[in-house]
Structure formats: C-alpha cells, structure tokens
C-alpha cells in the first residue's frame, strides 16, 4: 500500500506510522528521518539541506522532493510505503503524484488523523520538550492549518478521516479497519 499520513503536530502520526508499518509490512518514511540520514551520510542533498538549515531557512521543496524520490526508489519501498511529513503543500502533493505516475503508481489512501487543538496542546505539553510551550504549539498548529490542511481537500477522493483522540491501540485498529486490513 502507498499511503500518506496527514494530521496536525501532536496527532500521533509517528506513533501510528510505526504500528502501521509493522502491520502492513511497508517502510515508514519520515522527512525528518530523511533529512537526518542525508546530512549524517554527507550526501549532496544532505549538504544542500544543511546549508539552508544553517542559514535558518526552510529546505526548498525541490531538495525535499529529491530526497523522497531517492527513498521511494529503494527496494523496500517497491510494494508500498507510509509517507509522514511529505507532502505538506499542494505543490509537494503534485510532485509526489508525478513521481508515482512516472513509476505507474498512485496513492492508495491518505489517512488524516483528526484531533482537536486542545488535545494536541495537552499531548505536546505532556511530552516535556523544551520547545513545546503553548504559544509555540499554537503557532505550529496555525502553520499546519494554513499550509497543510488544504491537502485534505486535494486528496478528498482517497481521504480516510480517522478520529485520533482515543487510545493508541484503538486508533491503530480504526485505521487498519478503514484500510480493510
């Protein structure tokens, strides 16, 4: 299965991706992990990403998309994947669709984890990370609403909305049931 995971920060995408990856036998591909791997391995793409990050700038879509393309071309992703953190914008969604079409594929589903902002704030504050204060969290949620939420409409034909306010196990079961797995 070829899947994209959507949802605000703190929705539990990473947790669910790990469980789904095991259940579906496909790799969990996180853009954060891709950045770290490319930078630590000193790849050309990693060096480009590092330059932008060192300058305090966002890594351009072209660099991120190239990292994703390289990862999707690895053997373990031949039969499917879970993408987490890409696409974040309509432009990136269109690039992903082109990448998949070039290989004769398309997305099977886009899983949108739905969770209230108050629950997100509570979850993220409970993590105890230094950069997780309520103002920062609400700013991240606003960025998500403005940039990533339009993908929900873009993917309406393959979108599965999943209530992400239950237990980890319940959310995982609901997701697998929605995928008929």
From Swiss-Prot:
Pathway the protein takes part in: Purine metabolism; AMP biosynthesis via salvage pathway; AMP from ADP: step 1/1
Record-level GO cellular component terms: cytoplasm
Origin superkingdom: Bacteria
Which GO molecular function, any one, fits this protein according to its record?
A: ATP binding
Where in or outside the cell is it found? Cytoplasm
- Supply the alphabetized keyword list: ATP-binding, Cytoplasm, Kinase, Nucleotide biosynthesis, Nucleotide-binding, Transferase
- Give the enzyme class: transferase
Chain segments carrying region LID: 126-132
Catalytic activity line of the entry: AMP + ATP = 2 ADP
Q: Which residues are recorded as binding ATP? A: 10-15, 127, 166
- Could you tell me which residues belong to the region NMP? 30-59
Its Enzyme Commission number? 2.7.4.3
Provide the primary localization: cytoplasm
Positions bound to AMP = 31, 36, 57-59, 85-88, 92, 129, 140
GO BP term (any one): AMP salvage
Keyword Signal attributed: no
Q: Name one Pfam family in it.
A: ADK
* Subunit: Monomer.
Q: Which NCBIfam families match?
A: adk, PRK00279.1-3, PRK14527.1, PRK14531.1, PRK14532.1
**PANTHER family from the UniProt entry:** NUCLEOTIDE KINASE (PTHR23359)
Q: Which family does it belong to?
A: Belongs to the adenylate kinase family.
Q: What is known of its domains?
A: Consists of three domains, a large central CORE domain and two small peripheral domains, NMPbind and LID, which undergo movements during catalysis. The LID domain closes over the site of phosphoryl transfer upon ATP binding. Assembling and dissambling the active center during each catalytic cycle provides an effective means to prevent ATP hydrolysis.
- What is the purpose of this protein? Catalyzes the reversible transfer of the terminal phosphate group between ATP and AMP. Plays an important role in cellular energy homeostasis and in adenine nucleotide metabolism.
Q: What is this protein called?
A: Adenylate kinase
- What organism, scientifically named, is this protein from? Corynebacterium jeikeium (strain K411)
Q: Which gene encodes it?
A: adk
